[in-house]
Amino acid sequence: MTRLMKSLVILFGLFAMQVHAQQSAFQQDGYISGFGPFVRIPGDTMMPKEAEFKVAFDTGVAASPGTVNKTMVAAARFLNMHVDAGISPDKIDLVVVIHGSAGADVGTAAYYEDQHLQANASAPLVSALIEKGVKFIVCGQSAAFYGMSSGDFMPGVETALSAMTAHALL
């Protein structure tokens, strides 16, 4: 093996170890257990303990079948990292506004399986978030476009006239 090849192998190995070390820094269990990995940031992070949050996440594209909706994972991450940083969960008002094809990700098991012939990978996360007080609001216009009615959504999911209306009222 040439000297260049040996050097490249060593550099690749060091890079791989660095990536693994960075990934292992992510906390896997937080306020929303099993979802929303985050990293603890040491030191002063400008996080006043009396802070109150009102945050809306917006998702308009469904997750690929078999995967979890990334915007919903981001909502879980937001909760996990802020609760871990000392913010009381009752000071975090979180809403996920859903439009477009993403409505399927909050569909009932029967609806989702009928559409995709498999279980909804986002359902456990949606249930966990609703259980912790996160609101899910579906755009009524998108629901109508995709042929969904209120009975097609998981328990706890609300419907608004439109996604724009939901955002305007938040």
Each language-model region and where it sits:
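Structural recognition of the beta-strand scaffold that forms the well-ordered cores
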Residues: 54-58, 94-98, 135-138
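Acidic helix-start/capping segments at beta-turn-to-alpha-helix junctions
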Residues: 88-106
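Second-shell loop/turn segments in exported
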Residues: 57-68, 94, 113-115, 156
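Sec/Tat signal peptide C-region and signal peptidase I cleavage site
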Residues: 17-21
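Sec-dependent signal peptide recognition
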Residues: 3-10
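Histidine-anchored nucleotide/phosphate-binding helix
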Residues: 68-87
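A cross-taxonomic marker for long C-terminal extensions/tails that follow the last structured domain
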Residues: 22-34, 112-113, 118-170
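Acidic/histidine-rich, surface-exposed loop or edge segments in extracytoplasmic proteins
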Residues: 48-64, 106-110
